[in-house]
Amino acid sequence: VLGIKEIFVIRHGIADDATDHNDIDAERQLTKKGREKVKGVVKYLQSRRIRFDIVVSSPLVRARETAEIVNNACSRSRSLAISDLLMPDGSYDELITFLNNIPEEHVAIVGHEPFLSGFVSYCLSRSSMPYVRMKKAGVACITCDDPVVPGDCVLAWLMGPAQMLADE
């Protein structure tokens, strides 16, 4: 019996400019507004009873900070994994192999543009030409048979923080 994997693709929240941290992109942190938006998005996910079995994050600070907020609020296991597969220059196929090798069915991945929109497009169509746009703190939910096969996934929904925070 094929299982279903639900992958929640989450872009990090608003971060400060590289210049605030000696131009080290990897160390850019979420701004106060960025944190607040991520917390609002998390509230929305909670209101929809969305729970993750695992949260996987890019190692860059702004993604990790986003992932920690998501993990603390929406993770069943409080299991936060850090993976270079979600770096801005990651490989879609390697990320899919990773997803196929973990038992968890409800997975949140936290990373960066344009990698994430390319990944969503690749899962839906086998083309990495991004035809979805991920806003900062935006979430895309894609469903796939397990194992995940590029081109065989379905986009369940995609929202930016403005939609998720609309009824606050």
Segments from the language model and where they lie:
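Short alpha-helix plus adjacent loop in nuclease-associated cores
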Residues: 87-99
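Short, cationic low-complexity segments
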Residues: 162-168
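Hydrophobic packing residues within well-ordered alpha-helices of enzyme cores
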Residues: 66-70, 95, 119-120
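Generic beta-sheet signal
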Residues: 7, 104-111
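Active-site-proximal alpha-helix that buttresses catalytic centers in soluble enzyme cores
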Residues: 2-90, 130, 134
